[in-house]
A protein has these predicted regions:
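Regions immediately C-terminal to embedded phosphopantetheine-bearing carrier domains
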Residues: 3, 160-162, 168, 511-513, ...
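Motif- and composition-driven signal specific to adenylation
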Residues: 84-90, 97-116, 155-360, 365-374, ...
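Amphipathic alpha-helical regulatory segments at dimerization interfaces
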Residues: 31, 117, 132, 300, ...
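Short acidic/polar active-site loop segments enriched in Thr and Asp
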Residues: 73, 121, 259, 284, ...
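AMP-binding/adenylate-forming domain of the ANL superfamily
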Residues: 1-172, 186-187, 193, 294-298, ...
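Acidic-histidine catalytic/liganding microenvironments
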Residues: 36, 117, 188, 201, ...
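Short acidic/glycine-enriched loop/turn segments that link adjacent beta-strands
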Residues: 219, 317, 457-460, 636
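AMP-dependent adenylate-forming
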Residues: 1-14, 24-25, 63, 123-161, ...
């Protein structure tokens, strides 16, 4: 238990306000809708909703749920980014229930585990996700079927009952160290406090347009969705898949006059490298969170755009983010990045391992208290008791949440220093290595596995160290071991949890206390993986300065085994059948550091990941003269498929082929036209 000892030096308290939200988030939105019923609340492509239409649609969702959803149980939401998503989520809140966003593309076993923990009985779906959720034993409700005609007259119905602000608003599942995901339950009051703070802190007004591009399974989506609706502004949805392409994000910002948006720092870095980014002059505020913001990225932003850049911090166990810091306007003034000060009605403490406050400037673990806190973990009182601990009688809060983050308190605010445990962030995704290790160890060829985050070039990448099971040494160094391990994990964890690199060792090193030496394994991985990186080409200062090594390098060779890329020995790469295929194959070989690339092999099975696609995009342009969108690269993941796409062109909305350096706006229209044709 943290002890204050009357020492407030390691305590930060945000502005204390009298937040009055008796009807929770639905009440705040209803007040705005009453004042501006005809104003545009949300837009996605050519589809838009007025505030009145949103109220009517979400009311229909709420009434349906009140008839069929058990009281108190989370309602699963599996609807892609769209106006229907907004109506679905608001309808759940109006029904007095928490929403549980899920990714229907998650492995079925993981999805089933989440649903079993949640106890959900009803799912809001669209036509694509209906079969997936119905197959999980849930009662599906199609949201689009509840949408009324745009010009339908208002029908007088009994008003829905008010929803207390103490009600849970949502459940967000995150990685669990025991191998099982855990669901964080956030009350509506915590969400309202976070939104009202942001409205006031950044002077958000009805004229603002806020970009919604974060997947709804991440809590940052919360402010992107709800902040516009409590201020009378407009929520602009980036269509599904387009959030993966920085050029299309820039296109949307320009097209819609976006004024506020969010990036994880690694995506902001890629965004700033696109020439389109410099033309995003409508931006007023850009927010970063999800991982540490590098000084170089903040400086690059300040040199390119007039908007203000803000670094936010917060775990899933508190309402979205709980600290804020604004970067200096001039690039030359940015010499360190802080996470800053607490938001309204938030209390932060910095304590040593014995629960004593640390002096200013010393390192300690960050604790969070006050209004932003979650209620705990869904149906896991044991985990809740471990992470949410009582404060002593002298404290200004009743409960602290132990973040596991190391910080120190400076005059200008808190500085983030790392973790006290093994949790990592990879491309904005929070991952407990023990969850991946748990599933690795269930593979018959693996005796033990340790997963670490290693710095490879500019990125942090997930690396799995493998100790082979007895009698499996030869199998793990020959015959497609990496492919088997990837396939094994792909059935159990989300794609972002599957390591980019697999390395083998006869024994995994231990510390003097007998624990696995993760620090040493991280260092060894970084030494090996970065040793294979070539020097940057002349004139590529604005690009990623080096390519990543192949994901399948086994760098700690077993006895009598050679060190080599695993799958190259298993598959004989089919020879390119034409010049275009040959050029695409050469681009892949350059990015993946392979001598041979099977033309039907999947990019992600060969060690690729989402950010490596940006490198492939540039390499393909150098080799073929054609610049494909990142969205197309995600949907065409073999050499053969990409070569066909380059030869035939990307069908546009007018029937012509979009190839070469097509404007991002035209590429976006082509993608939307293709999606519409597939729906029709």
């Amino acid at each position: 238990m943290p002890r204050s000892h009357g020492n407030e030096s390691a305590r930060l308290t945000g502005r204390q306000t009298a937040r009055h939200c008796p009807t929770g988030l639905p009440g705040l939105i209803r007040d705005v809708s009453g004042r501006t019923p005809n104003r545009t609340a949300a837009r996605c492509g050519s589809d838009s909703l007025s505030y009145r239409q949103l109220e009517v649609w979400s009311d229909a969702v709420a009434r349906t749920l009140r008839d069929c959803a058990p009281k108190g149980l989370p309602v699963v939401v599996a609807v892609p980014r769209s106006t229907a998503l907004l109506a679905a989520l608001l309808g759940v809140l109006k029904a007095g229930l928490p929403y549980l966003p899920v990714d229907p593309d998650d492995p079925p076993a993981r999805l089933a585990g989440v649903l079993e923990t949640a106890g959900s009985r009803v799912a809001l779906v669209n036509a694509r996700t209906l079969p997936v959720l119905a197959g999980q034993g849930l009662r599906p409700v199609e949201v689009e079927a509840l949408r009324g005609a745009p010009d339908a007259p208002d029908v007088e119905l009994d008003p829905l009952p008010d929803v207390p602000a103490e009600q849970p608003a949502y459940v967000m599942f995150t990685s669990g160290s025991t191998g099982t995901p855990k669901g964080v339950v956030l009350p509506s009051m915590a969400l309202c406090n976070r939104l009202l703070w942001m409205r006031d802190a950044y002077d958000v007004v009805p004229e603002d347009r806020i970009l919604q591009k974060t997947p709804v399974t991440f809590d940052v989506s919360g402010w992107e969705l709800w902040l516009p609706l409590i201020t009378g502004a407009t929520c602009v949805f980036l269509p599904p898949e387009e959030h993966r392409d920085p050029a299309l994000v820039a296109c949307a910002i320009q097209e819609h006059g976006i004024t506020l948006c969010h990036f994880i720092p690694s995506m902001l870095r890629e965004f700033l490298r696109r020439p389109e980014a410099g033309r995003c002059g409508s931006l007023r505020h850009v927010f970063c969170s999800g991982e540490a913001l590098p000084v170089a990225v903040a400086r690059g932003f300040a040199a390119l755009l007039p908007a203000r850049l803000h670094n936010l911090y917060g775990p899933t166990e508190a309402a979205i983010e709980v600290t804020h810091w604004t970067c200096p306007e001039r690039a030359e003034d940015i010499d360190r990045i802080l996470i800053g000060q607490p938001i309204d009605n938030c209390v932060l403490g910095v304590f040593d391992p014995d629960g004593r406050p640390v002096p200013d400037g010393d390192e300690g673990e960050l604790y969070i208290g006050g209004m932003p806190l979650a209620l705990g973990y869904l149906n896991r009182q044991d985990l809740t008791d471990r992470a949410f601990v009582p404060a002593d009688a002298d404290a200004s809060v009743r409960t602290w949440y132990r973040t596991g983050d190391r910080v120190r308190l400076l005059d200008a605010g808190l500085e983030y220093l790392g973790r006290v445990d093994d949790q990592v962030k990879i491309r904005g995704q929070r991952i407990e290595p023990q969850e991946v290790e748990h599933h690795l160890a269930s593979h018959p060829e693996v005796a033990a596995g340790v997963v670490v985050a290693a710095r490879v070039g500019e990125d942090r990448e997930l690396v799995a160290w493998i100790q082979p099971a007895e009698g499996s040494a030869q199998a793990l160094t020959h015959g497609g071991a990496v492919r088997r391990l990837r396939e094994h994990l792909a059935d159990l964890v989300p794609p972002g949890y599957v390591p980019t690199h697999f390395l083998a060792a006869t024994e995994l090193p231990l510390t003097s206390s007998g624990k696995q030496d993760r620090k040493l394994l991280q260092q060894r991985a970084e030494q090996r993986l970065n040793a294979h990186r070539p020097a940057p080409r002349a004139g590529e200062a604005g690009e990623a300065q080096a390519q990543d090594v192949l994901g399948e390098i086994w760098c700690e060779a077993l006895p009598h085994a050679e060190t080599y890329p695993d799958s190259q020995t298993e598959e004989i790469a089919a020879a390119p059948t034409d010049d275009t295929t040959g050029r695409v194959s050469a681009a892949w070989a350059e990015v993946l550091k392979r001598e041979n690339v099977p033309i039907e092999a999947n990019f992600f099975d060969l060690g690729g990941h989402s950010f490596k696609l940006f490198e492939l995009q540039n390499a393909l342009e150098r080799h073929t003269g054609v610049r494909l969108s990142v969205v197309d690269l995600f949907s065409h993941t073999t050499v053969a498929a990409q070569a066909t796409l380059i030869r035939d062109g990307v069908p546009s909305d007018d029937g012509s082929a979009v190839v070469g350096r097509a404007a991002p706006a035209r590429r976006a229209r082509a993608l939307r036209a293709r999606r519409q044709r597939s729906r029709d």
